[in-house]
Each structure stands twice: as structure tokens, then as C-alpha cells.
A protein has these predicted regions:
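Conserved glycine-rich FAD pyrophosphate-binding loop
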Residues: 1-139
Length: 139
């Protein structure tokens, strides 16, 4: 467990030390399908060429990988993130794997429906999973 935190801290520190030479840093939690045998991605060259550095670390026996990417200077962070998420979706992976969707990711329909059942008035955590922020889930 400690190694995971050391790895995460080291890439973040590297990025902060060399931020003038580097692009943005992306951090992803990805749950691979249980039958996945290729744990380390093989990205298409046109996507792979956008990274200065990649670091992977994970959990034993559960197929959850934490993947940190440092982009090359000038690369569009939002576009690359979307390309990565599309790549993961095509592999059948789930994201985020460990820390729920928060306000950053779209909740898939079953999860969105679950939130609506738990909170019919949308009073407790409106906007979670990029759902409606309006009372009673109005759009």
C-alpha cells in the first residue's frame, strides 16, 4: 500500500519540479474487466505520442489500476482525457474505479437512477455524476 502512495507522490513532485517544460498531468482510476490479460495499455501511436511520461500502479487481485500521465507541453489535456476514456470504454473498463464519479464524470444510467431513488428531491448532492443540479431532477 505504501508503494502506491510513494509512486503517486513521486510523479506529482516530478511534475511540479519540471512544470515549465511539461504539459498537464492526468490521473485516472481504471477498473479493467476481470478477464483482462493485458494490464498495460497499448495505445495507438497518435495518442501515445502525446505523453512525456506514464506511470501505472495498482491493487493486487482486483484489476484496479491508477494511471498517471504527464502530457507533452502544448498538448490539449481535455482532448487527450476524452481519447483515453474512449479507449478504456472500448476495452470494457470502468472508470473511475475507486472514488466514484463525483462531479467530474458522467454517471451511467443505473447509477443515476440509483441517485434519484435515494434522493427524489435532489437535495443532498445535486449535480453528482454530472446529473441535474435542479430541484426534483429537472433539466
Amino acid at each position: 500500500m505504501t508503494h502506491r502512495f510513494v509512486a503517486a507522490g513521486s510523479i506529482a513532485r516530478y511534475h511540479s519540479l519540471y512544470r515549465k517544460k511539461l504539459g498537464a498531468m492526468l490521473s485516472m482510476d481504471i477498473a479493467l474487466p476481470r478477464n483482462e490479460q493485458e494490464w498495460f495499455e497499448k495505445l495507438p501511436p497518435e495518442l501515445n505520442d502525446k505523453f512525456e511520461m506514464k506511470l501505472y500502479y495498482g491493487h493486487l487481485f482486483c484489476h484496479v489500476l491508477h494511471q498517471n500521465y504527464i502530457l507533452k507541453k502544448g498538448v490539449d489535456e481535455k482532448r487527450v482525457k476524452r481519447e483515453l476514456l474512449n479507449f478504456y470504454e472500448d476495452k470494457g473498463a470502468e472508470y473511475p474505479a475507486e472514488h466514484n464519479v463525483g462531479h467530474e464524470y458522467h454517471a451511467k444510467k443505473p447509477l443515476s437512477d440509483f441517485y434519484k431513488d435515494l434522493d427524489p428531491t435532489n437535495s443532498f448532492n445535486h449535480g453528482i455524476g454530472r446529473t441535474s443540479k435542479l430541484k426534483h431532477w429537472r433539466e
